[in-house]
From Swiss-Prot:
Family annotation (InterPro entries): Caveolin (IPR001612), Caveolin_CS (IPR018361)
The protein's name in its UniProt record: Caveolin-2
Similarity field: Belongs to the caveolin family.
Organism: Equus caballus (Horse)
Chief location: nucleus
Length: 162
């Protein structure tokens, strides 16, 4: 049994096992992590990170290194990636989480207690400012524009060809 789709007299049959349900980006399978505990990236914020050996280092068909070199470099890549990541997270995760918490707490506080009250105050004052601006426009700017229009309406240009 396969997947059948029809479009413009074309049929496509695929096996369910070989059919990839995602397009291009290799998303982590949530069921795969159900046994290991919580999914640490439930919103798939870092699904674009491809740090596998084959995604970083690739040899074209015309230039291959020795098999032992390829195997050793693959092993060293994976081990160093694992060890360095663990080392960096031990020393950087807690301080960076602390700094990010302070930053987001500060931004949230500023947004809640300063920015939104300021925006609401401006929105409350805008109808009054609009009324005052309309009055200033009607009293000062409209007569100036009317008199300038009348003055320039009496100007006539004549072009002569000499």
């Amino acid at each position: 049994m396969g997947l059948e789709t029809e479009k413009a007299d074309v049929q496509l049959f695929l096996d369910d096992e070989s059919y990839s349900r995602h397009s291009g980006v290799d998303y982590a399978d949530p069921e795969k992590f159900a046994d290991a505990g919580l999914d640490r990236d439930p919103h798939r914020l870092n699904s674009h990170l491809k740090v596998g050996f084959e995604d970083v280092i690739a040899e074209p068909v015309s230039t291959h290194s020795f098999d032992k070199v390829w195997i050793c470099s693959h092993a060293l890549f994976e081990i160093s990636k694992y060890v360095i990541y663990k080392f960096l997270t031990v020393f950087l995760a807690i301080p960076l989480a602390f700094v990010a918490g302070i930053l987001f707490a500060t931004l949230s506080c500023l947004h809640i207690w300063i920015i939104m009250p300021f925006v609401k105050t401006c929105l409350m004052l805008l109808p009054s400012v609009q009324t005052i601006w309309k009055s200033v426009t009607d009293v000062v700017i409209a007569p100036l524009c009317t008199s300038a229009g009348r003055s320039f309406s009496s100007v006539s240009l004549q072009l002569s060809h000499d």
